[in-house]
């Protein structure tokens, strides 16, 4: 923190802040959700982080963003894993179901192999749509190769 912000913060202060925030984070992560979301975007973002040993490693942050029936965006969940995979997405979808989500009308996802099958196993009536951003990125590869 001192390098980034110019402020020195003691280990006791960091522990006190963490102790106050963790219960709120746990409550947010386990809160009940709406039963239906018309649209849900699911994607993982990869970050370099420092692990317990002080080594720089890459971790996947799984993000689930939904549009509720009133048209408002809601961050439904954030999950951390070593890497992105359909099996972990299945556990994310199961968590959403356990927290009250009964149906997703449209799931916007990247082209990860096995991801549509994971969605269909938990939400069999959900239409799966490849995210427009991912469609453009994938198309550009072929355009550049053709030039």
Each model region followed by its residue ranges:
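Generic structural signal of hydrophobic/aromatic residues within well-ordered alpha-helices
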Residues: 21, 28-29, 136-139, 143
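Short acidic (Asp/Glu) and glycine-rich catalytic loops that position anionic groups and cofactors
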Residues: 71-72, 132, 147
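Inter-helix linker motif
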Residues: 123-141
């Amino acid at each position: 923190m001192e390098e980034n912000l110019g402020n020195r913060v003691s280990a006791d202060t960091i522990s006190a802040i963490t102790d106050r925030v963790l219960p709120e984070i746990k409550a947010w992560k386990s809160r009940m959700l709406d039963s239906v979301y018309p649209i849900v975007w699911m994607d993982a973002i990869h970050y370099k982080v420092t692990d317990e040993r002080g080594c720089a490693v890459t971790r996947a942050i799984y993000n689930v963003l939904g549009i509720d029936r009133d048209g408002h965006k809601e961050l439904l969940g954030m999950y951390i894993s070593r890497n992105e995979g359909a099996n972990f997405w299945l556990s994310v979808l199961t968590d959403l179901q356990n927290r009250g989500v009964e149906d997703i009308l449209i799931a916007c996802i990247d082209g990860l192999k096995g991801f549509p099958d994971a969605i269909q196993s938990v939400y069999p009536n959900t239409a799966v749509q490849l995210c427009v951003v991912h469609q453009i990125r994938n198309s550009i590869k072929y355009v550049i190769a053709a030039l």
